[in-house]
Each structure stands twice: as structure tokens, then as C-alpha cells.
């Protein structure tokens, strides 16, 4: 029992869910030519239907890989509203971010979702650096690219962040006023959780973990070692005993039902120096754009959405929309909850873009 409790504490602190035992679902992405793992994913580009286009561009010297979704009967000579979509921590563009990108494209939008720099299919070394400044720049770079895409009306640009991508979307929108309407789904405040633990469960070890992160950076600079967060293999039995839905259901989503080989929650330990001093809810008063924050009524991560929403004091148009009965992870895949979120997003973007 003591071992199980220790593993749960580690997972709550770093959300380090290992995907090494996800072979049973990797066959699904292998069957999809775009390696998409969500239900109803595009399997081929058909004229007159929603299409997917894999694109690349640079952030400094790093190659970023993204998917652009174009709506049915896309005509490059026309003008379309575009939505930038930021994926969850450890996630990739082929999972929930791709699902929402496709569903919004079905509503007539051009959408883009990219793998974060140093992660997924994108370039950058050391692998799996996970720093807030990078994630925010990923969002700004998606806006740069999609604003120049044929058919996009750059004056009508929306932003959607999911889970950790939601926190970074809030930060990006504070300064980048190209984004005219801001939305999040199941927002996760990465810095607060990396610092304090989920629901403040790891406050006692803050200084210890900062020491470890500092030591890891010193090793990197000396060229001796790239140190990563612990790579714990979580079994189904262990997951079932976890006290929080977010981590219990997250295990099944990322390791079983929607696993992708590019998705991993392992990241460089030195990243904690940046993560633990970040708070997505800081400077929320800088957001003056319309704001929609969506979360499940049963999400144990809801406190993060509520906190950020309450701090958004300078937008005259904001709404906190709860999906009745949904948990955090269920907003990633469960058809009835995804449909509620997409319908709300479509209405929000239609009115505000």
C-alpha cells in the first residue's frame, strides 16, 4: 500500500504517465494514414469534404509539424475564420487537439494544431523540453502560419487551448491581440500543479524539487547528462486506485484508448525551473477579448478554470460553461460531451469572430 501511495504522489506531482504499455491501441494509429487516434478521424482527403493537410514551418531553427484542417468545399479564393488549437501537456496533435480541430472544421472553420517544439513530431533537442515560454511561442507561431494560409481572414482569428494548452492559451492571449476570441476546454494550470502538486498535494516538497531541477540544469550545461522526470510504468490496477479522476482516467486515455507513440509525459527535469515559477492565472486582467472557459461539472481540475475565470476582470464578455456530468478527461473523447463543447465553441466563435 505504501508503494502505491508513493506512486500516486509522484503521478499527481508530475503527471508522468508512461505510454510504454500502450501497444494494444497503437495499432489504431497505424491504420490511420495520418496516425490520428480519435473517433471519426479523417482517413483520406475527399473532394468537397473536410480535409487535413500536414505542414511544416520554423520557430527559429526548429521544425514544427502541424495539421491544418480545411472545411468542406474549401475555396482558397474565399475568406474563412481560423482557430488555433493548443494541445494538452504530453499530448500530440493526433489526439484530442485533432478531434476538436476536425470538429470545428466541420463547422466551417480553418483550424491548425501543432506539436509543441521539442515534443511529438516537431524538432528540437534535447527532446521533451517542457517550458512555458516555448509553449506560448508555439501558439504565437501557429497564429503566424495560419494567418498567411490561403483563404484565412487574419482579422478573424480564434484561439482554443485544451488542458495545459488552455493555460498557455490564456497567457498567449494576454499579449497577442490578433486573437479576437479565446476559449479553453478543461484548462490545466501547469505551473501551479508542477509547483504545488494537484490540489496542493506536494507543497512540502517544492524546495526539494527545485534543487533537483537546478542540479539537472547544471548537468545539462556541463554536457554530462540530460536528466528526465521519473518514468513510472502505471498498471491498470495502480491507476484504478488513484484518488483523482484526472490521473486515473488519463492513464486509460493516454495508455489505452487513445495512445500515440509520440505522446509522452516524460520531460527534462530542468524544465521544472521554468514550470514551477509559472502561473497561467497571472495577469488575467490583460485579457480584454471575449472569453469562454469550458469544463466538466465533475472535473476535479475545475478549480483551475474557476480561478483563472474569476481573475479575468477586464473582459466584458466572458462565460464559464459547465458540461453537466463530465470529468476532465471525458471532455477529450466522450461523444455527447465533445458535441456539447463543440456546439458551444461554434456559437462563441460565430458571434465573436
Locations of regions flagged by a protein language model:
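Alpha/beta-hydrolase-fold enzymes
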Residues: 170-251
Amino acid at each position: 500500500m505504501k508503494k502505491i501511495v508513493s506512486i500516486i504522489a509522484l503521478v499527481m506531482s508530475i503527471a508522468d504517465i508512461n505510454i510504454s504499455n500502450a501497444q494494444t491501441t497503437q495499432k489504431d494509429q497505424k491504420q490511420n494514414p495520418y496516425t490520428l487516434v480519435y473517433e471519426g478521424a479523417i482517413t483520406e482527403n475527399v473532394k468537397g469534404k473536410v480535409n487535413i493537410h500536414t505542414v511544416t514551418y520554423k520557430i527559429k531553427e526548429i521544425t514544427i509539424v502541424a495539421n491544418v484542417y480545411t472545411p468542406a468545399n474549401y475555396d482558397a479564393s474565399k475568406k474563412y475564420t481560423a482557430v488555433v488549437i493548443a494541445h494538452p501537456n504530453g499530448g500530440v496533435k493526433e489526439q484530442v487537439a485533432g478531434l476538436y480541430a476536425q470538429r470545428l472544421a466541420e463547422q466551417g472553420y480553418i483550424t491548425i494544431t501543432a506539436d509543441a517544439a521539442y515534443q511529438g513530431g516537431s524538432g528540437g533537442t534535447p527532446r521533451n523540453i517542457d517550458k512555458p515560454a516555448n509553449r506560448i511561442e508555439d501558439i504565437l507561431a501557429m497564429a503566424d502560419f495560419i494567418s498567411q494560409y490561403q483563404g484565412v481572414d487574419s482579422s478573424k482569428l480564434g484561439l482554443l487551448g485544451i488542458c495545459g494548452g488552455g493555460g498557455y492559451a490564456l497567457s498567449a492571449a494576454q499579449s497577442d491581440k490578433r486573437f479576437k476570441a479565446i476559449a479553453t476546454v478543461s484548462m490545466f494550470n501547469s505551473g501551479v500543479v508542477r509547483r504545488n502538486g494537484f490540489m496542493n498535494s506536494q507543497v512540502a516538497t517544492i524546495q526539494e524539487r527545485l534543487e533537483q531541477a537546478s542540479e539537472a540544469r547544471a548537468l545539462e550545461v556541463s554536457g554530462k547528462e540530460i536528466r528526465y522526470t521519473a518514468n513510472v510504468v502505471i498498471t491498470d490496477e495502480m491507476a484504478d486506485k488513484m484518488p483523482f479522476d484526472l490521473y486515473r482516467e488519463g492513464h486509460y486515455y493516454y495508455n489505452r484508448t487513445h495512445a500515440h507513440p509520440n505522446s509522452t509525459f516524460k520531460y527534462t527535469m530542468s524544465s521544472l525551473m521554468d514550470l514551477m515559477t509559472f502561473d497561467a492565472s497571472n495577469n488575467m486582467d490583460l485579457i480584454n477579448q471575449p472569453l469562454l472557459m469550458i469544463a466538466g461539472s465533475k472535473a476535479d481540475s475545475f478549480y483551475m478554470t474557476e480561478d483563472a475565470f474569476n481573475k479575468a476582470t477586464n473582459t466584458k464578455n466572458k462565460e464559464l460553461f459547465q458540461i453537466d456530468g463530465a470529468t476532465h478527461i471525458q471532455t477529450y473523447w466522450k461523444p455527447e460531451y465533445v458535441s456539447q463543447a463543440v456546439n458551444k465553441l461554434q456559437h462563441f466563435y460565430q458571434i465573436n469572430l
